[in-house]
Amino acid sequence: MTTNLTRSEAQSRTQLLEVDSYSVHIDVSNAETDADTYLSRTVVDFSARFVDSTFIDLIADSVSSVLINGESLSPAEVFDGARVTFPVRAGRNSLTIEAQARYSTSGEGLHRFTDPADGKTYLYTQYEPTDARRVFANFDQPDLKAEFIFTVTAPAHFQVLSNRTEARTEPADGSAGAVTHYFEPTLKQSSYITCITAGPYEGATDEWTDPRTGQTVQLGAWTRASLVDHLDADDIFGVTKAGLEFFTSEFDYPYPWGKYDQIFVPEYNLGAMENPGLVTFTDNLIFRDKVTDANYESRANVILHEMAHMWFGDLVTMKWWDDLWLKESFADFMGGLALAEATRFTDGWVTFALRRKAWAYTQDLYPTTHPIVADIPDVEAAKLNFDGITYAKGASVLKQLVAFVGREAFFAGSRLYFKRFEYGNTELADFLECLAEAAPDRDIANWASAWLGTSGVSELSLQLTTSDGSAEASEGSSAVSGGSIGFANGGASASAVSAQSGGRGKLVTSSSGARLRGPDAVDDNFDAATGAAHEAGSGASGSVEPPRRRSGSEKITSATIAQADSAEGTALLRPHTIEIATLGRSGRSIVPLDSFRFEFSTESADVEQLIGRSAGVITLLNFNDLDYARVRLDPESTEAAVTSASRIKDPLSRALVWSALDNAVRDGLMPVQKYLTAYARSLGKESHAGIMAGLSQTALTCIDQWVADRNFDAAIMGLLGAALDALAAAKAGSDAQLHLANLVLALTSRTARCAAGSSAVAMGRGFASQVLAVPVGEEIDRMYAGAPGQSGQAGSAGQSAETSGGTRASRGADHSTATLPFRGLINDHALRWNALTALVSLGWADQTDIARENHSDPSSSGRLRAETASAALPLPIVKIRAWEAIREAGALSNDVLSAIIAGFIAPSAMPLIEEYVDEYFDGLLGFWMDNSIEIARRLVLGLYPRWSVDEEAVVEKTDAWLAANVDAPAALRRLVIERRDDLARAIFLKSTQSSRH
């Protein structure tokens, strides 16, 4: 069976065929039974340019009949499990295939889900890149567009939707209680964006009328019956209408697909999918529990991203997955633009600058990095290229392109592109040609070569001299505490680094063989709550001068900007259009004093516009975030940022400064403890929900991966103390209060790694106990003491008191954190599960507690949280059973598998899963070969043993596996290489830390 369609095979079919239409009948009348398969019947009419033989894609349990031009072929002879081979004649042809396709539990193909809340069954399809073949026979490649006519037979009480409106329904022949739904033909489109949903979905309808054309678009928003009370249709429709008005106006092209249904479905592998007329979303975007404004912003962004695809991707589609960026980069950029300009989220680019671009930077520093326009030889490679480069880097580079050619020229080129290639397929050259016509005064070809055809991220730095004669270099050329750290592949890319055994100042080896050293002694003796830190460098004496800060009165006497490329390891030069700003004090705030636009394409350039201006306290490159580049702050700007980032008034500038600090700590240019100190200072001061979420993500990565074991207790205790203090002082009912509560619980779950008797454990356990003592819907404003089992023994052995939430809170020894009221903090299921899972990891709650909580929350999310908590129990037998379940991944749904993996690898006080390191590497090929690519990806990534107590041994085992499996699928090797890179980075960053003294 050959499931991996190659580019060359697709090109051969394109040269041979032109597809006219598909008539597809799907019979899911048995969906609510134990049946594993359903009937799929396809009639495809097409033309062939010459006599030949070819194949159509189909992954099915069995094929019962194959007819080509009326001639019957033997299924046993022509079907191999993934392809049906047949002869074609020159001219018109008709192929009919009838098969039994399998209901999916992996989120690929036709996924079936039974809601544990009410027992109702739901179906939906998900195809990109090539899973339409799991549902019906088709030529599953983007450039063989056709008209699709769907008919679906389903139980009578099912709501059935597809890309087009329903034409009529009829009672089904031979299926009692079933109805057949006939849908209007689609417009010409690719197979991967066809869609069917069926089930007792509920929702709301609305409509939008285009003020320019008078066109009325029918709107729908749908979800499961158990979630419909939380649908928030008014908000969803509000964003939808704003987006339709924005895009139809900016693109000067009416919405082309008729209706606009949006359906939120369970166990979805993606955020959403741009099926024209029927956009599918994960129902994680339906908020049952309270969330911060960052979640509402994220949902709006996803809605607008998918809507942008109606033009970029659906109307005009890439020929092959090499040009995936022609839809994903554009949708990411356009979604962000519409978010900021057409909705209430006017600062939507803030979250993009800090969080979305961090994804791009990380991906771009892996040894597996690739150009935005990538080489995609097959569909397995395509599946993995839905990554931070194709999405976030591509979107950021498009922001740079808009800055380079101007907004009007960019949109003029886009409008020309839609009109010239509507309902067709394109490649890079087609868009560039349209853009060049719209911007004749710009060298589009050179820009595209520099930005789209190269990999890696530029690093921008600024060398300043101020009026007092001091020279200030960016971090990239200065010492962290006096000693320069160099890394291959930019900063600390561990593509790079293969940690050798040894103590502090370990030797690491780059991919080129260069030997690199980190600081011999960077002291982790710090208190994150107070911000006190002591640092020592790698100089001969280990002493350094204290960091110097600008007063704000200095004048700049010289300024030079420089660029270098991290991934290439050379001075790869790109044209940059950026803004530069100086930030200074205004009362207690830090605000822009001056800013200007600057263009350069050389390795370095003098910035004469800065001379004579105030240096302020922070000099910020890439002000307003027009560029895709990692900014290196000069040392004095860094010191100001570490102590005062929260005082920067403009949230976008604040996000950009934090982004620079994030990159510095990741690259080993800033001590981990210094970053955590800066982060601790921000707690309680930061009010932007997107920034809070981005900073906590980096801080938790520091705790999970980059803090040395010997410093772990001090680091987490400092952060927990700071977070609890900030939570106690937070405004009642605010985003900050909710974020801090979840942060405290996230940190608490990690205290399982702390030494016995650590006060950090007691601090976190006290708050978790407080959460579990309060029922859902009530305010956590009372004073409690103790935690489950705190009286001396874990779990049921503790003295307990029942609560209406279903989990007992045992009365035990008092401690300070258990007496804090958190007024305005309303308890919900999410908080309770976070608290319970933390206590489970600590051994202070057991299976009885989990069962009771699940009984009080029988929803699908409750079931998943119970699976995670159960697998997190720190008992050897639990880990054995979890591993056995994981190894039988085919019997689990995608989300249940991930939930069990999350619990299996949860922190615990004992190294309970060390024995599975070797089993992981022994099973890697089986993970990949025996499962669909989505399930395989979850296994390979989720189980990679970075949790091992012997990280260096894991790197060695990874290298041995890669050396022994050079012929393993490239997509599998890529995942393993990237996980190795993360682990090698962690080893390096830990090696730069000394023990406390």
Model-derived segments and spans:
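Acidic/His-enriched low-complexity segments
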Residues: M1-G258, D289, Y361-T362, D375, ...
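Surface-exposed patches in mature extracellular/periplasmic domains of secreted proteins
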Residues: P254-Q262, W321-D322, T346-W349, G413, ...
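Cation-handling catalytic/transport regions enriched in His/Asp/Glu
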Residues: I263-V265, N269-G271, K290-N295, W320-L324, ...
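Non-catalytic accessory/interaction domains
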Residues: A154, A308, D375, V397, ...
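Acidic/His/Gly-enriched intrinsically disordered linker/tail segments
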Residues: A272, E328, D332-Q400, F404, ...
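Juxtacatalytic substrate-recognition/specificity segment
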Residues: F150, V179, E202-M310, D314-L324, ...
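Alpha-helical scaffold elements that line and support the substrate/ligand-binding pocket
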Residues: E306-T317, A331-G335, K393-S414
